Amino acid sequence: MAESIRVLLSEEEVDKRIQEIGEEISRDYAGRKVHLVCVLKGGSFFMCELAKRITIPVSLDFMSVSSYGGDTKSSGVVKIVKDLDESLKDKDVIVVEDIVDSGRTLSYLLEMLRDRGPASLRLCTLLDKPDRRVVDVDVHYTGFQIPDEFVVGYGLDYDQMYRNLPYIGVVEFDN
């Protein structure tokens, strides 16, 4: 089965929206330091660009949580692959994610991080698929709401491919 990619959000659209989110976070946390927690691998492209656009002090940490196999649907099974290196105690934490889909993974992750005692905990996602939501998740900063299509680019992959695309594209499968 071959696939092709159709552009959903251009590089320019994505870049402009990330700038706006960076400005919003800078205003919301003015006078404070924010601790960004990147959910790897997909969130890395978004977090790197976002961090450059935040004008207040920022610290970074990374974790890897898996709920996808080689398929196009979330498996619903959450596994922590890499945990954080730093404590979240008393920090203003923003979890940076590439996409919110069913909400299962992030619900689990946010509950786990909440138990670590941050001063505040918010979620920032580049993409949100509200039509796929199974578990309610409070997203504080959203880049784009998108339809229920399988997307790649800007860190999102299909079977480890297409992460490097500078735009968000829809995978279209040839039958």
State the predicted function of each range:
Residues 1-175:
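PRPP-associated nucleotide enzymes
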